[in-house]
From Swiss-Prot:
CDD domains: RRM_RBM22. This is Zinc finger CCCH domain-containing protein 40. Pfam families: RRM_1, STL11_N, Torus. A zinc finger (C3H1-type) spans 157-184. Residues 329-347, 389-428, 452-466 have a biased composition (Low complexity). Residues 429-446, 473-482 have a biased composition (Pro residues). Keywords: DNA-binding, Metal-binding, RNA-binding, Zinc, Zinc-finger. The keyword Zinc-finger applies. The keyword Ubl conjugation does not apply. GO terms for cellular component: Prp19 complex; U2-type catalytic step 1 spliceosome; U2-type catalytic step 2 spliceosome. It comes from Oryza sativa subsp. japonica (Rice). Residues 228-301 form the RRM domain.
Length: 482
């Protein structure tokens, strides 16, 4: 690389770009990202050539990330410049090449001179508009890729690194430490090399994914030959009925498609059992529609299970403690009058006997706990149902009739204290006011009448009034003459 320092940087072929080639997981979930761009800041960890480095923070709780390889090496393998995973499927290079049967180990040279010449040759073809022969090509994804591909971004990969001082027990920052206070993971996945990831050799993550693909179970058809329905789970508003029809129609004729958006699932029913088995075999563990991985299972019949008499009776009076006694006894007995001419015949049980189906509005009167007279302190008829008052009410009626008063008896006192008060069942209720006798009523006020002697004396003392025939003469006026 020493001879390159004497030449013009613009004609050298080094990378100069305005935006990196990265995956959605490394970019982060924040739509507003501030990036730092530095030309020729680092050398590529694959070809050792200077390139433009981009640095940014993908999220609030994430660490700063930067590009690790140049765009030339990135385009040769179709991988991200940061995590070196496939841009289309999100898988390591070794998993992708193994699934697509691509042998790219010998396609890219590893020596310094040959690798530099190989990169410059591809850059020249790219500037000339020639589609250079990349190692990955454009192949159709097979079953292994469809099973293992990542359909949604994985932002957990952008978390901060583990604090090394915390591992040694010497971190004094506490909650202000920008690194994670966790113990590091040990095992095969902790030893990873960037060159092994790029070339697809001895990658522990790829080996784990390939082993997982071989252990995935397949859908076993049920023994019941009448089942022709497949269950699809994990739906959202983006997937429509037409999308499901386009995906499943290639395996057989579809009888019906029922979507249950409240449960985020759907049921696809085929006209034949062979079509359902073929769809379950070809789409098991690899059903992806509009980039969303869906769950595929065999449907189960929903046959009603009849209950015995005792279980049905218990379910029918499950809320018996909240109803009046008359209603409870009527439900428990189940004795309903039969129409004339039907005595002694067994009636068919109604639908509510087997299923707890609520009655339609207005069919019967709704009973609430507040309507129970036994919990409101009201007068309750005797249990015989003859309408006679109880013993306490009869005693109070006899006492009121003997005294001749219509108001109840005054409150009694026990040893100078009020009788103990117990709150009613179901919550607090203020005690009722004790009735007292009303104050005595007096007749309305009338003025006192005078006796005959007093009336004669008063009339003699008062002068007689002038009559109409007597002229009232004014008193004479005295005049003086000068």
């Amino acid at each position: 690389m020493a001879h390159r320092l004497l030449r013009d940087a613009q004609a050298d072929g080094w990378e100069r770009s305005d935006f990196p080639i990265i995956c959605e997981s490394c970019l982060g979930d924040n739509p507003y990202v501030r990036m730092l761009r530095a030309e020729y800041d680092k050398e590529c960890k694959i070809c050792a050539r200077p390139f433009t480095v981009f640095r940014w923070r993908p999220g609030r709780d994430a660490r700063y990330k930067k590009t690790e390889i140049c765009q030339t090496c990135c385009k040769l393998k179709n991988v991200c410049q940061v995590c070196l995973l496939d841009l289309e499927y999100g898988l390591p290079v070794q998993v992708r090449d193994t699934a697509l049967a691509i042998n790219s180990n010998d396609a890219i040279p590893r020596s310094d001179v040959n690798r530099e010449y190989f990169a410059e040759e591809h850059d020249r073809k790219a500037r000339a508009g020639i589609d250079y022969d990349s190692s990955h090509g454009k192949a159709r994804p097979n079953d292994t890729i469809l099973k293992l591909q990542r359909t949604a971004p994985y932002y957990k990969r952008n978390r901060a690194h583990v604090c090394s001082f915390y591992v040694r027990g010497e971190c004094t920052r506490g909650a202000e430490c920008p690194y994670r206070h966790e113990m590091p993971e040990t095992g095969e996945l902790s030893q990873q090399n960037i060159k092994d990831r790029y070339y697809g050799v001895n990658d522990p993550v790829a080996l784990k994914l390939l082993g997982k693909a071989g252990e995935m179970p397949s859908l076993t058809p049920p023994d019941d030959e009448s089942i022709r329905t497949l269950y699809i789970g994990g739906l959202n508003n983006r997937i429509t009925e037409q999308d499901l029809r386009d995906q499943f129609y290639a395996h057989g004729e579809i009888e019906s498609i029922r979507m249950v958006l409240q449960r985020a699932c759907a049921f696809v029913t085929y006209t034949t059992r062979e079509g359902a088995e073929k769809a379950a075999e070809e789409l098991a563990n690899k059903l992806v529609i509009k980039g969303i991985r869906l769950k595929l299972m065999w449907g189960k019949p929903q046959a009603p299970k009849p209950e015995d008499d005792e279980a049905g009776r218990q379910g029918h009076v499950a809320h018996g403690g909240m109803l009046p006694r008359a209603v409870i006894s009527q439900q428990q007995s189940g004795d309903q009058p039969q129409p004339p001419g039907m005595e002694g015949q067994q009636q068919a049980p109604s639908g509510s006997y087997y299923f707890n189906i609520p009655a339609p509005p207005g069919a019967e009167r709704t009973l609430y706990p507040s309507m129970d007279p036994q919990r409101m302190g009201a007068l309750v008829k005797s249990q015989e149902g003859d309408g006679k008052p109880g013993p306490q009410q009869a005693a109070q009626a006899q006492a009121s009739s003997s005294s001749g008063q219509s108001y109840p008896m005054p409150p009694q006192y026990y040893h100078g204290q009020y009788p103990p008060y117990y709150p009613p069942y179901g919550g607090y209720m203020p005690p009722p006011r004790m009735p007292y006798p009303p104050p005595p009523q007096y007749p309305p006020y009338q003025p006192m009448l005078a006796t005959p002697a007093q009336s004669q004396a008063s009339s003699s003392q008062q002068p007689a009034p002038a009559t109409l025939h007597q002229a009232q003469v004014p008193p004479p006026q005295q005049t003086t003459q000068n």
